[in-house]
């Protein structure tokens, strides 16, 4: 709780205070604008901390349990990736749509994670190896990114991808 400079550990009670009632398993994501997204079952909740407003989205054909779900945002929209399905929640339109025109690379990424950068680029990576795929925008082709071969580490498995306001992309590996 930033207003009270307090660390909250009872998340369900806090969510209830802001109008989000959850039962069972849920996922939480804080977006690039520091707003809260909560996903549970076929519902997505968006809480804007600055305006103290809550939006609710219905995600049709979304499985109730998605333990392998990866979440990212581009500052406006939320992207949900699981198995070989990519969904985009359009915050301004208050709707969810399946991004069918994006075919995910079938190369040997076993466990896919997604990161969307500030410029609309989409990054896929795995915690288990150094494979990285990048798409400049939804309409462009996938490019496989190779990490510099002179990096001397025992493992280049990608742990995270972030970009900064200067346009630099930072790729975190095991070592």
Show which residues each predicted segment covers:
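Carboxylate-rich, polar loop motifs that coordinate divalent cations or form catalytic acidic clusters
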Residues: 1-175
